Amino acid sequence: MIDQNFWQGKRVFLTGHTGFKGSWMALWLNSLGAIVKGYALSPPTDPSLFNEAKIDSIIDSQIGDIRDLELFKRSLTDFNPDILIHMAAQPLVRSSYANPVETYETNVMGTVNVLESARACKNL
């Protein structure tokens, strides 16, 4: 069971909010009363759930790349979240075969950047 009071007013920083699962997470968190900031690449498909649900109108949405440590760290620390949910990734197996370096940079080093940036947040 979900304690809806837990999420009410919580500052949640969500990576990957333009993807399918991240979009659903943004909608869910918003419905529970969280203050959500999303950070992700532009929506990966057209149409996308992100655009169709107009998620950028209900949360603070920033288009950016987790591989850019300085931009990501500034965005995260400026928001000063209570909770960080990391959903940004390159999830496609075929794409990983075609672009293994980009997949590694995003999924491994991007996650390192998220964790390194989180260390600078006093509320996390």
For the regions a protein language model found, what residue spans apply to each?
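N-terminal Rossmann-like NAD(P)+-binding domain of SDR-like oxidoreductases, especially those catalyzing
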Residues: 1-124
